[in-house]
Regions:
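Extended alpha-helical targeting/anchoring segments
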Residues: 1-343
Length: 343
């Protein structure tokens, strides 16, 4: 967690930039003048920034041979079958196993972020530079949000690729909403969200709005629901975050048993994958994204992780392909960035 007193906010809708400086007031007039000077310095840096590359967006699809995974296809399929056995035995209803992909990169990480913004625009876009570690993400999904004590979780479960025309999109959306497996999985995750909010909400305040509506993203169509509740006064915002983590869509149900199975089956720790990226404001509002469609960069090593929700009637081959599909946007962004040239 980082406490920052300086923000540069880019409004994508209005194409405007706001520079915000938090003033810790001791000498009001002097502190105000210093804040103005700091803002002016940032404006000069922004205007003089020439570190720009040309991105060739029309690059071919990523070559999977350039990527390695922490498990083979056969090992992933075996994990899916083990999860199905746990489900059949009544241990869990769903488990979300994942695999982690790795590639040596030879490009500026900022260009990967720029490419990802273009290829996979999402509600949550982030590039976090911690010197030795960089986090780049394009997440479609809210972990938890609080606005004026109203808590919101938006489960996303049920996915299908977009069509080439509006008519195809409509047909695919109908197909998605008629898929019994996808619907059952979504309803289960809505119930999880209700439970997560219910643990910290005022009694009787939890409700679902716009149940199972369709949302279209750049490459896929999702089924989405909105779950709300009024935060009880005795619970802090940190308790809200604690109850929301990890997201049911990244662990399974029941959460604790699903996480135990994931711990048993996955060969490496997840690190940021399935965690959260977001902010806490001084007025106690929060907004956190689930860390999916997210790359971690350590030096020249880039990692991206993706999984699939396993239920009783899951088809192992299909779930393996889903994990590849979910990682593909980051992989494509890397391909584009590596083909870029300096202007």
């Amino acid at each position: 967690m980082i406490f920052t007193d300086f923000l540069i906010v880019f409004d994508n809708l209005k194409a405007t930039i706001k520079i915000i400086k938090l003033i810790r007031v001791r000498n009001p007039e002097e502190d105000y003048e210093k804040a103005l000077k700091d803002i002016e310095d940032i404006i000069i840096k922004l205007k003089n920034n020439k570190d720009v590359s040309f991105l060739d967006i029309n690059q071919k699809e990523p070559d999977l041979k350039e990527w390695s995974s922490n498990m083979t296809k056969e090992e992933f399929i075996n994990i899916v079958n083990i999860c199905k056995n746990y489900i059949e035995n009544g241990d869990v209803i769903q488990v979300v196993p994942s695999q982690r992909f790795h590639k040596k990169i030879h490009t500026n990480p900022l260009n990967i972020y720029r490419a990802l913004r273009y290829l996979n625009p999402s509600p949550y876009m982030y590039f976090l530079d911690f010197d030795n570690v960089k986090i780049i993400g394009s997440s479609p999904e809210t972990l938890v949000k609080i606005q004026d004590d109203t808590v919101e979780i938006r489960p996303i479960a049920g996915t299908i690729k977009r069509g080439k025309t509006q008519e195809e999109d409509e047909e695919l959306a109908k197909k998605l909403l008629s898929d019994e497996k996808e619907i059952a999985e979504h309803v289960m995750l809505v119930d999880l969200a209700r439970n997560d909010i219910g643990a910290i909400a005022e009694p009787g305040s939890v409700y679902v709005d716009n149940m199972m509506h369709i949302e279209k993203f750049s490459h896929v169509i999702h089924i989405v629901s909105n779950v709300y509740g009024k935060k009880a006064k005795q619970h802090s915002i940190f308790e809200v975050i604690k109850h929301a983590l990890p997201a049911g869509t990244l662990s399974g149900a029941p959460k604790v048993r699903a996480m135990q199975i994931i711990e048993e089956l996955e060969p490496t720790k997840r690190n940021i994958y399935g965690g959260a990226v977001g902010y806490i404001s001084l007025n106690q509002n929060i907004d956190f994204a689930i860390a999916i469609r997210t790359a971690t960069i350590l030096g020249n090593d880039l990692y991206v992780q993706a999984g699939a929700g396993i239920v009783a009637d899951s088809i192992p081959e299909k779930e393996y392909l889903e994990s590849l599909s979910k990682a593909s946007s980051v992989m494509k962004a890397v391909s584009v960035a590596e083909a870029s040239r300096e202007l």
